[in-house]
C-alpha cells in the first residue's frame, strides 16, 4: 500500500468511530450517487460502496489510483478518475445520472478552492449541483463555517458559506484518528447547498462588499467601505437598518449583509 505523501497533504483516517460519523451524517440511501474527493486507501470508499447506488472517486496520486483499481476491481458501481478534482468538469466527464452527494476526507491544503467548486460563488450564481456535502476538514475552517456573527472567528468565509449553504458541525476529530497524525485538529461538517436565487439584488456587489468589508478586521465597517460607498450615505443606510455605526464586518449577520448590499448598491444610493 502506498505511503502518505506530504505534497498531497495525505493523512489516512484510521478511526472507525469517525468513519461511522461521516457515513451517518451523509444519510446515504440506496439511490444516492456519491462523489468522493481524495479516496486515499479506500477506507471511506468501501463504506460508501456498500450503501450507495454508485461512487465516483477522484484521486490525483498515481500510485493510489493503481492500488484503488486493484482493490475495487470487482465493484461495478465504482468509478475512479485519476485527476485533480479542481480540474474536474462534472458535466463533461461523468455520465448521467450525476452524483447527488459529496462525501470526502479532503486534502486540507486546498480546502478553500474545493469549497468554492462544490458550493459555487456568491458572484457567480448557479443552482446547487449537490443535495448534501459531508466533509472531513481542518477544525479551524469548520469552526469558521459555523461561526456566529460577532465572534472573533466570524469572517468572509463564514458569510459566503452560510449564504450558499446551511452549515452544520457534526463532530470534532482528534489528530489521533489519522495516520500519520496531522499537526491540526479536524472536524466533520455537513453542508446543505441553498437554492438560488438568494434574496440579494446584485450578488457581484455583495461579493465585492464582503471582500472589502473584511479586509481590515480591526477597522469599523464605515472605514473599510469608504472606497466603495460615500461615508455619509453608508451611515444613513446603517442607521436605517438598525446597525451600529461602530459595527465591524464580523458583527453583521448574513441577513444584514444582504440588506446592506441592497441598500448601498450604486443603483439605490
Swiss-Prot record:
GO terms for molecular function: 16S rRNA (adenine(1518)-N(6)/adenine(1519)-N(6))-dimethyltransferase activity; RNA binding. Its main location: cytoplasm. Its EC number is 2.1.1.182. One of its GO terms (cellular component) is cytosol. InterPro entries: KsgA/Erm, rRNA_Ade_diMease-like_C, rRNA_Ade_Mease_Trfase_CS, rRNA_Ade_methylase_Trfase_N, rRNA_adenine_dimethylase, SAM-dependent_MTases_sf. S-adenosyl-L-methionine binds at residues 11, 13, 38, 59, 84, 105. CDD domains: AdoMet_MTases (cd02440). It is an enzyme of class 2 (transferase). It is found in: Cytoplasm. SMART domains: rADc (SM00650). Pfam families: RrnaAD. It catalyses: adenosine(1518)/adenosine(1519) in 16S rRNA + 4 S-adenosyl-L-methionine = N(6)-dimethyladenosine(1518)/N(6)-dimethyladenosine(1519) in 16S rRNA + 4 S-adenosyl-L-homocysteine + 4 H(+). Keywords: Cytoplasm, Methyltransferase, RNA-binding, rRNA processing, S-adenosyl-L-methionine, Transferase. HAMAP family: 16SrRNA_methyltr_A. Specifically dimethylates two adjacent adenosines (A1518 and A1519) in the loop of a conserved hairpin near the 3'-end of 16S rRNA in the 30S particle. May play a critical role in biogenesis of 30S subunits. Belongs to the class I-like SAM-binding methyltransferase superfamily. rRNA adenine N(6)-methyltransferase family. RsmA subfamily. This is Ribosomal RNA small subunit methyltransferase A.
